[in-house]
């Protein structure tokens, strides 16, 4: 089974009984007010295991979400991004890049999602150029500083469900 099985079941009920679409927030869906929502006697929610163990997305250009505050909260649009991912059967997310990745890791984890990292942030570490803007980003020259950033990234996420990204593309 899945640790998120109950969550997926709740979202299935919200779709099939309440009629709430998976992307309700993104298309300004307003539910119809009803006195009751009858549940058919033969109603069942069954699931089959996903064929792919880890399913998720990278929220690219996430800085565009910052301007979309809802309820006067920068976090609310992120909650809706992560809810949409869960509604679609996802279980893993790269919660942004640079400062945003650290800012929204806990929210994603609290919602039951695995965390992984942008290719420029191995082990979820702060980008070398951000931490040391005046130094050459060279492991040969500053290996100790890279290792310290990686260790800090691991320490910050040790209690989260993480799929560790070890590489850097290119």
Predicted regions and their residues:
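Feature activates predominantly on carbohydrate-active enzymes
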Residues: 1-146, 157-169
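Conserved Class I S-adenosyl-L-methionine
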Residues: 152-154
